[in-house]
Amino acid sequence: MSTKKDKFSLKDKFYMEIALKLANSRQGLTGTNPSVGCVIVKNDKIISIGQTSFDGRPHAEFNAIKNCIDDLDGSKMYVTL
């Protein structure tokens, strides 16, 4: 049994779960690229999401940044890859 303390908060796990759901929804639809999900959070609020596009490009991170209308300064990105 491990004695290491979990380094991820419940909020981190919550946002990563959303990113995983985004990735899973594109399984098999992204060509040779992996299906990836991305969630951008700022001040405990989701400000953007992204997924790997059909046929694999653009990538999830690019899509999330492109779709974001808020300032990204101070935000955190959760990515499944």
For the regions a language model picked out, list residue spans one by one.
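Secretory/periplasmic and organellar redox-cofactor proteins
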Residues: M1-K5
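Short, basic/aromatic recognition patches
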Residues: F8-G31
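Zn2+-dependent cytidine deaminase-like catalytic core
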Residues: K13, I40-L81
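Conserved hydrophobic/aromatic pocket- or pore-lining residues that grip, position, or stack substrates
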Residues: A19, G37, D44
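Generic detector of intrinsically disordered, low-complexity, polar/charged segments
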Residues: S25-G28, P34, I47, S53
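Acidic, glycine-enriched active-site microenvironments
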Residues: G31-V36, D73
